[in-house]
Regions:
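Alpha/beta-hydrolase superfamily serine-hydrolase fold, recognizing
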Residues: 50-307
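A glycine/proline-hinged amphipathic helix-loop "lid/cap" segment
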Residues: 1-67, 300-307
Length: 307
């Protein structure tokens, strides 16, 4: 474990976790996340960002270096379905683009409490359908996301299958929240070890998102779904000391049970979605290197081009 990670773990436990445990003002939480992103997240040199609409949904496209515009990663940002945005995660999109040679599309999906389930999933589907209508080959489209966005990526895999849409080339998920029944053993086992996420707030966040929907619904809790045979290959990264450790393990097991190729990668001392600190934290850069190689492999070979 690097010295910088040790220091970050200390600060998160002393400052961030107590704040998240007591904060109730959604607008204030959003502002705090936005400020943290501006202060702490590093944008790769030469990163390019372009806003537009895709399937009626506002998106931000991130790219860096030489990319092939036919290769696309749709990345769903995390934030418990109530905060976060393409802006808070655009640096991550650019960093992934640099590593896999694809452009990264970050949808501005609707958030709670203004818009409950299934609004986020509807927006995710709209983006994917728009790419398919535009002639993009699903063999060159990947889904990805972190935390709540990671769970949303797997929900979209299930939703696409149910609607007769083709599966994506692969899925990459960082610390995904995949079981909203809140029955994962690690929620309690790692409650004290997790330096950032307070277990005591998850039920409130979950209930606001569901607004009465059944947490057992596979589109809500993909870790409880029966995936169709031969699901897309998946790379799942998580921490051994975060409360969502078992959410990551469970979705991986479900995919493997359906015959899917799954790469599970666990870090021993990292915090929830440490990958956001790319450029500052060597453990984040190592994780993104692994994710980029996985995406490059499964998105297929094409001829890259500038911008």
């Amino acid at each position: 474990m690097s010295l910088r990670l040790t220091l970050l773990n200390f600060v998160l436990r002393a400052v961030e976790k107590p704040y998240l445990a007591r904060a109730t003002d959604v607008a204030a939480l959003r502002r705090q996340f936005d400020r943290a992103a501006e202060r702490w997240f590093i944008h790769p040199e030469g990163a390019r960002y372009r806003p537009y609409r895709l399937g009626g949904v506002k998106v931000l496209e991130a790219s860096q270096g030489r990319v092939d515009r036919r290769r696309v990663l749709i990345w769903f940002h995390g934030g418990g379905f109530f905060q976060g945005s393409p802006e808070t995660h655009r640096h991550l999109g650019a960093a992934l683009s640099a590593r896999c040679g694809a452009r990264v599309i970050l949808p501005r999906y609707r958030l709670t409490p203004e818009h409950a389930y299934p609004a986020a999933l509807e927006d995710a589907r709209a983006c994917y359908e728009a790419l398919l209508r535009a002639g993009y080959d699903p063999a060159h489209i990947a889904f990805g996301g972190d935390s709540a966005g990671g769970g949303l990526a797997f929900s979209l895999v299930l939703d696409a299958h149910a609607r007769g849409l083709p599966a994506p080339a692969c899925v990459v998920a960082f610390c995904p929240w995949t079981d909203l029944t809140l029955s994962s053993a690690s929620l309690r086992r790692n409650a004290r070890r997790d330096v950032m996420l307070p277990f005591t707030r998850l039920a409130e966040v979950r209930d606001t998102y569901l607004n009465g929907a059944d947490p057992q619904d596979p589109l809500v809790s993909p870790a409880r779904a029966r995936f169709p045979e031969g699901p897309p290959p998946a790379l799942i990264q998580a921490s051994r000391v975060e409360i969502l450790e078992d959410d990551a393990s469970a979705i991986g097991a479900r995919l493997q049970a359906a015959g899917g190729l799954v790469r599970m990668q666990f870090w021993r001392r990292t915090f929830h979605v440490w990958q956001l600190l790319q450029g500052r934290l060597q453990e984040a850069d190592q994780a993104l290197d692994q994710a980029g190689a996985f995406l490059a492999l499964h998105l297929g070979k094409t001829e890259p081009e500038e911008g």
